[in-house]
């Protein structure tokens, strides 16, 4: 197979990250390296410090991890550069670093991911490379990135200016600029991990770029997954934020905890972590609901393996969440709402596991149907394996470059 040089751009990169989008970048980069490709990743350590103020570390300007060349962005202006990038959509520091990397490594493919900390200027095409963008969230069409109107409900009728103000953010005037429109036109292809995302972008983008649906993937399981030492539990994996529906899930265990013959284990952290822990203590749920925070990869696989089901009670329009794919790869069923592209995943197992927000209580209470782990793993093999992703990804690159 022909080998190529890739440059990935991303706001985050593990372990300096918070969500599944950065995990996807890591998975993709490392799998490409295993195949003999050369992969470089440019990401914002300033952005990570902004979201995690207690982080005091620093990184080298270039370091190699698992065969991937990493370029952490650390502006001399620190947070000020982030604010300027947010307000203007561009950063001279980031543009300079990006241009320098293009000249140095001469990539065949530049693949952009979540770039809200980098600015839209990196989308501009400066050479003959394939210029790709994966829409991990709704940043291209929504200043909040999540299509949550006023941060409360899914946006059905746009009122971006007032939504921005009520969300306590400054309006990004550059979104209506000619330069932003021109840069969008420089993207060769937008990868939408869900059909829902593809449809939303097609409806809302001011230009009509080429958009293809290629679902995310997760690597194959480790050969030996240990026992978690937990049993009879539902599992939640994700950030602890309102839009993920985690508060609704914990509330169900408070209201009918004795009617649910299982525990709830919560893996993840976020702004609601302390509030959830206080709620558990206040309502004496310590023997029913457990908040584990972030855990090691080995422990996470063990928890997937031993759980009854992964529960994803999302309020917002999910895209193609990595946690759901990880669960399926272990043979674990997924219970979740039909918001966004989440239902596209769950229906491949059983449509009865797709629930409305007010139906979550009934599904969890009555969850007794046995599911074949092997059949669920077949869903992974068919739709969410790296082999399937690679086939579509390389075909896309070949089409762009011809």
Residues covered by each model-derived region:
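Conserved donor-binding/catalytic core segment of Leloir-type glycosyltransferases
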Residues: 7, 191, 226-244, 250-253, ...
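A conserved mid-protein helix/loop that constitutes part of the nucleotide-sugar donor-binding site
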Residues: 23, 239-255, 271-277
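Membrane-proximal helix-turn-helix segments that form the acceptor-binding/catalytic region
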Residues: 139, 154-190
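Carbohydrate-associated surface elements
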Residues: 196, 217
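Short alpha-helical donor nucleotide-sugar binding micro-motif in glycosyltransferases
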Residues: 294-295, 302-307
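Acidic donor-binding loop of glycosyltransferase active sites
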Residues: 305-319, 332
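Short hydrophobic beta-strand element within catalytic cores of glycosyltransferases
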Residues: 329, 333-336
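A charged, aromatic-enriched C-terminal amphipathic alpha-helix characteristic of glycosyltransferases
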Residues: 369-399
């Amino acid at each position: 197979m022909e080998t190529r040089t890739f440059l990935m751009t991303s706001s985050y990169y593990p372990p300096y990250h918070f969500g599944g989008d950065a995990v996807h970048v890591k998975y993709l980069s490392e799998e490409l390296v295993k195949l003999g490709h050369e992969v470089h990743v440019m990401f914002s350590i300033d952005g990570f410090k902004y979201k995690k103020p207690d982080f005091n570390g620093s990184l080298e300007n270039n370091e190699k991890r698992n065969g991937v060349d990493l370029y952490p962005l650390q502006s001399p202006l620190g947070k000020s550069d982030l604010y300027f990038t947010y307000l203007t959509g561009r950063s001279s520091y980031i543009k300079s670093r990006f241009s320098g990397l293009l000249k140095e490594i001469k990539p065949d493919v530049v693949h952009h991911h979540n770039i809200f900390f980098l600015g839209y200027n990196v989308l501009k095409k400066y050479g003959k490379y394939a210029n790709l963008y994966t829409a991990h969230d709704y940043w291209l069409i929504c200043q909040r990135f999540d299509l949550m109107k006023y941060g409360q409900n899914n946006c059905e009728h746009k009122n971006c200016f007032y939504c921005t103000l009520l969300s306590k953010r400054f309006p990004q005037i550059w979104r209506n600029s000619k330069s932003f429109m021109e840069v969008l036109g420089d993207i060769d292809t937008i990868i939408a991990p869900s059909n829902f995302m593809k449809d939303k972008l097609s409806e809302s983008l001011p230009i009509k770029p080429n958009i293809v649906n290629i679902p995310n993937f997760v690597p194959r399981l480790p050969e030996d997954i240990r026992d978690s030492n937990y049993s009879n539990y539902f599992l939640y994996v994700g950030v602890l934020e309102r839009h993920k529906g985690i508060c609704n899930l914990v509330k169900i265990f408070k209201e009918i905890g004795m009617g649910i013959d299982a525990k709830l284990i919560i893996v993840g952290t976020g702004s609601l972590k302390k509030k959830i822990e206080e709620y558990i203590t206040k309502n004496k749920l310590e023997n029913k609901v457990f908040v584990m925070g972030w855990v090691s990869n080995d422990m996470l696989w063990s928890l997937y393996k031993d759980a009854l089901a992964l529960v994803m009670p999302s309020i917002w329009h999910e895209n193609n969440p990595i946690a759901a794919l990880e669960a399926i790869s272990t043979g674990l069923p997924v219970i979740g709402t039909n918001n966004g592209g989440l239902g596209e995943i769950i229906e491949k197992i059983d449509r009865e596991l797709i629930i409305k927000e007010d139906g979550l209580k009934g599904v969890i209470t009555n969850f007794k149907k046995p599911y074949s782990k092997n059949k669920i793993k077949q869903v992974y093999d068919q739709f969410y394996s790296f082999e399937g992703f690679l086939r579509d990804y390389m075909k896309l690159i070949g089409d762009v470059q011809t």
